[in-house]
Amino acid sequence: KQYGLAHFLEHMAFNATEHFPHGVMTYLRDHSLVFNAQTGINETRFQVNNVPVADSEATASMMLLLKDWCNGIKILPKDVEKEANIISEEWRQSRNVNKRLTEAIAPYIYNHSDYATHNVIGSEKQIHSYTAKDIKTFYQQWYRPELQCVAIIGDIEPTEYEKEVKRIFGAIPASKKPITRENALVPENDTPLYYRFIDKENTSNSVGIYQRNLAITDPTKRDVVGDQLKARLFQRLASQELAMLRNDAKEEFITATVSYSPLVRQYDQNAWDFVPYAGKEQAALKQILAIRERIYRQGFDSEEFEQAKEALYNEMKPLMES
């Protein structure tokens, strides 16, 4: 198992690299750049914001930094030891009720698939057992051009930047013996899965109804944008259904939310979360299920649908014009 190695490598990426031998953090902070990185179940993302596009030196440095993250991270033993202590403290701080809840419901969210036991940060024992060689091997195995993507967003000349991306990143050699990346499958369940979480530190009583859906395979740009717009429209319209109950003072819950978003690679998730009034757990559940079923069978009112589209367009229009 390589649990925790992707997250460990994310930490290493902010230490020494080929073009930033004194550390990436020093450069980013000295130039007041906003940066972030996150490792999830399927991928690691690095992000730098507020890069002044009029400053050619800054943009050139960021291109080299992105290239270094792809292929030029220096994995030094002294940095491994330092980051192991930092990650270990991160692990200890994460051992709270929210973490216990996440781990408890994972077998039901992912139906006992490999995702159910996947531990992004790893165990404390694993964190301190990994060596520079282990991390370097992981880096060489999985940080390959065909598994990477570079996105540059801003007021730029696309043709020039595309040329630079091809020049800089095209120099990264392909792996001679690439390991196949296998996508874990989440099996269908014949009946709904149920889990009740009880914890002495859990002070709120909440309920979640989650439904997995297969995502589009090899989506086009149009597919991705279309799905995002549909998800936002669905969330807006479904939320209005919940709001109507509150306006009529007929709701059996304190608060309720609905969302449609990516779950893991190849799967999306429709989630209904609500906090019922004390003693109204079953009534609230029946009420949410009734709304969910009505939407599934009848859809939305055509007038409300057009109003939602117009409202979403008006929200997005300033962004498109800026």
Task: Please tell me what each predicted stretch does.
Residues 49, 56, 107-148, 158, ...:
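Histidine-acidic residue clusters that define the catalytic metal-binding segment
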Residues 149-207, 303, 310, 314-320:
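An aromatic/glycine/proline-enriched structural segment found at the starts
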Residues 17-18, 51-53, 92, 153-157, ...:
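Solvent-exposed coil/turn segments that connect beta secondary-structure elements
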Residues 1-52, 96-101, 117-123, 233-268:
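M16/MPP (pitrilysin/insulinase) zinc-metallopeptidase core fold and M16-derived inactive scaffolds
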Residues 1-5, 23, 30, 41-45, ...:
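Extracytoplasmic
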Residues 16, 48-83, 245, 261-321:
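M16/insulysin-pitrilysin zinc metalloprotease superfamily fold
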Residues 177-242, 273, 322:
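His/Glu-based metal-binding/catalytic segments typifying zinc-dependent metallopeptidases
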